[in-house]
């Protein structure tokens, strides 16, 4: 399994917590590598540790905002979308990680309201 998958071995196929499998301890150690954020990269003890590191990362937050943009706009972002992404990130942050604030920021932006049609 990959270094990001091993931490989730602490849960079985049904999502139940476990410490052993066939009477042997489950290895839940993993590693975040090549994330683009040196503070994020490194070993993790288990899924909880990994989730904590991801939750504290501004880079992960920015990736989340970018993926929300792609979903709601139905397209990939361009350089011209930087102000929309920055405003969405600001709304998300200022509202304590509110998905509602993020979506509202995106769907009220000019990029969403004034779409162009390609022939």
Cite the ranges covered by each PLM segment:
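Active-site substrate-binding loop specific to GH73 endo-beta-N-acetylglucosaminidase modules
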Residues: 1-59, 65-69, 82-94, 104-119
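Core structural elements
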Residues: 72-76
